Amino acid sequence: MKCDEIFAALAMLEKERGISQSFMMEKIVQALTTAYKRDHEGVENVVVDVDEGKRELKMFVQKEVVDEVENPGTQMSLDDAKAISAKYNVGDIVNIPVDNIEFGRIAAGNGKQVIIQGLREAESGMVYDEYNSKQHEILTGVVTRIDPRTGNASLRIGTGTEATDALLLAGEQVKGETLVEGQRIKVYLVDVRRQSRGPQVVIPRTHPGLVKRLFELEVPEIYDGTVEIRSIAREAGSRTKMAVWSNDENVDPIGACVGPHGQRVNSIVDELRGEKIDIIKYSDDPAEYIAAALAPADVIDVRLAEEGKACRVIVPDDQLSLAIGKEGQNARLAARLVGYKIDIKPESYKEEE
């Protein structure tokens, strides 16, 4: 590429892609100096003068004026320096212009390649910055492909120039859901990782944060801070338990989340493909909180351990299986929700004591 072509290309990239000319020019200057050093062994100090007004690039090799030359790549004799200009003395630095033909050859061989590579780096950096600022937010993506072998889904996140591709792994999809190409789904942005092939956007649908953000979007009282989500325990695709608290005694936190005729919670259940959601009222009283967490089972008594976060819960005999849940799920989620180890016993066990 000729110099004027380089300037024209950078101006176009800044206008159409939003990539600054200074960023790209820095990449080009670095590539040109590296290429020259590679072709001229021993040369160390190479500078490129950028004249944006004249749309010119000029390359110089810098050498120090010395009495006795030991390294021709970095030094020049006083006589040679005086031949250029009588002003030079020992210790001065001389800028020796690189022949225009040679510089043109280097620019032609590296300019286009560097612009392409710099474009990739710049776009990669822009994608990283864009999505790194959206961590722990909900994004909407369109399924573009399903890998029939692994079940992984490729998604297009965002629109226009800000759109990027992301991979939703099979293990991070909601259990039991079947995704199809063209389907729009909500995902939760957990992390953005820098990788050689570009940023990796981590977007599971299994994270508890997805449920929290969905309620924030659906329930105005949560969005404005009147109702708080204190804790969430989730087994994606099956069941979620969520503890809520109201900062206004006139607002029922559970009712706010459920909504009129269950509209709010049902909307979220639909998004999560039928996942059951238990909403309980948070309490600062551990025993009361634990009892509520084991809903829908009734609790007769909660005995807290004297040390550590553990307890024994007594339930009616006919509700033992309900309290424990299928494959222990209800008890397991309750324990995670409240942060206590829970030992559930039937009422007959209490009588035997």
Which residue stretches match the model-derived regions?
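RNA-contacting regions in translation and RNA-metabolism proteins
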Residues: M1-E353
